[in-house]
């Protein structure tokens, strides 16, 4: 379960809203 304010980024659940969060998510995915 994800809240909108949570910056969670994984394959099963994504709670990213806005450019900053999406960039953060992309960085976290690339880092593995």
Swiss-Prot record:
Cystine bridges: 2-16, 9-21, 15-25
Gene Ontology MF terms in the entry: ion channel inhibitor activity; potassium channel regulator activity; toxin activity
Coiled-coil residue spans: none
Recorded superkingdom: Eukaryota
Subcellular location(s) per record: Secreted
First-listed, main subcellular location of the protein, grouped into a coarse class: secreted
Tissue: Expressed by the venom gland.
Pfam families: Toxin_12
Keyword Disulfide bond: yes
Cell wall biogenesis/degradation as UniProt keyword: no
SUPFAM superfamilies assigned to the protein according to its UniProt record, in alphabetical order: omega toxin-like (SSF57059)
GO cellular component, one term: extracellular region
Keywords of the record: Disulfide bond, Ion channel impairing toxin, Knottin, Neurotoxin, Potassium channel impairing toxin, Secreted, Toxin
Role, per record: Binds the voltage-sensor domain of the potassium channel KvAP (from the archaeon Aeropyrum pernix) and affects channel gating.
Entry remark concerning the domains of this protein: The presence of a 'disulfide through disulfide knot' structurally defines this protein as a knottin.
Family: Belongs to the neurotoxin 30 (phrixotoxin) family.
Protein name: Kappa-theraphotoxin-Gr2b
Organism of origin: Grammostola rosea
